Amino acid sequence: RQKGKIAELALGYGGSVGALKSMGALDMGLEEEELQPLVDMWREANPNIVRYWWDVDRAVKKAVKQREPSSIGSVRFLYKSGMLFIELPSGRRLCYVKPKMGVNKFGSESVTYEGVGAAKKWKRIESYGPKFVENIVQAISRDILMYAIRTLSHCFIFGHVHDELIIECSKDVSLDVICEQMGRTPPWIPGILLRADGYETEFYKKD
C-alpha cells in the first residue's frame, strides 16, 4: 500500500526514480534497487496515462512547429498571436508565452516558453508532455471545483483546500444533500463520474 501511494503521487506526471526520491521513498523504507522496477511497474499498469503524456506532447509540438490546431478528446491545442493555448473542456484556456522549439539536456526536441521560474524570475521554461498533462489535469480539477462552488452558492462556503470545500452551516443541514450537489457532473464534461464525500466537525481538520 505504501509503495502504491508514493508511486501515484510521484509518477503520475512523468516522474521517475528522482521523483520517488524527492517524495521520500528511501526515507519510507524503500531500497534504491526497488525504485526503477517500481517506475516500470507503474507505467506498465497505467498504459493509458503514459499514452496520454505523449499524445499531448505531440499535439503541443504540432501547434508550436506547424501552427496547426489539434484536439485530444475535449482538449484543444492551438497557436495564436505568439502564444500556445490549451483550451480546456470548460472553455477556459491555459496560455504559454512565446513558445518555441528547443533541445533538452538529453538531446531531444522539447518545447520552451517564457514564464516565472522557481526563483520567481522571468525566464524561458522547458516543458514536455507529462508536465503539460499535469497543467491540464490540475486546471480541469480547478474548473470542476469551481462548478461545485457555484452549485453550492446557497451555502456559506468560507474556504477551500485542494479539492475540499469548507462549509459553515447549522446542524440540521443534510450532509448527503451537500455531497450530492457537490458531485454533480458539469455540462461541459459529460460522462465523467464524480462522487463527493464529506464529514461534519466542530472545527476544520483532515478527516
Where are each of the predicted segments found?
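Conserved catalytic core of nucleotide polymerization and phosphodiester-bond processing enzymes
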Residues: 1-207
